[in-house]
Amino acid sequence: SEDGRIYVGSYEEFGYFVHTPYNTLEYHSLKDEVKDFTFHNDEIWNIVCVQGEIVFQSFGSLFFYNGNSVEGIRVKSLPLNLFQVGNTFYSQRINGGLCVFSGRKMEELIPRKVFGNSDVLAGLPYDDAVLMLTRNQGGFLLYRDGRVEKWKTECDDIFRKHTINRAVITKDSCYVVGTISDGIYALDKKGK
């Protein structure tokens, strides 16, 4: 992370490592800093930095660490994923729509049916829009000004045939898509 810490999580435990002057790592647990929260099978499986806070995600809770304190919240609808595009923090609920975070609450932005009942695997910046990679739609969708449209690429047929697992954007604006059974693909902003 930007602060030089290595954030980690596991079953009902999360925190960070810092480098010591002796070239070792020292662990600092954050679990006991969560006030008024009862852990219940919370396994941390995703960690992201959002608007200056570190967010630890379990299958039923989110933990927000601002550098001084930790707040834990149970979510009614379980988040499938978390991703940030610009200053906006998104999550898709399991079997639900795509939501935007407003404070500590998720507000539905796009209903699941717009994605063909598919999972949104990633959200990436694309000029003034959000480029979303979906599992069942065979590739990418663009969200701009309240509308969703297909982003056509030269790999659409491949993405329909093979299970897509992940996508990232490189520093030079190349979209890299990983599949489970057919390797990785790199696309430019024109979908080539």
Label each residue range with its predicted role.
Residues 1-192:
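Carboxylate-rich, polar loop motifs that coordinate divalent cations or form catalytic acidic clusters
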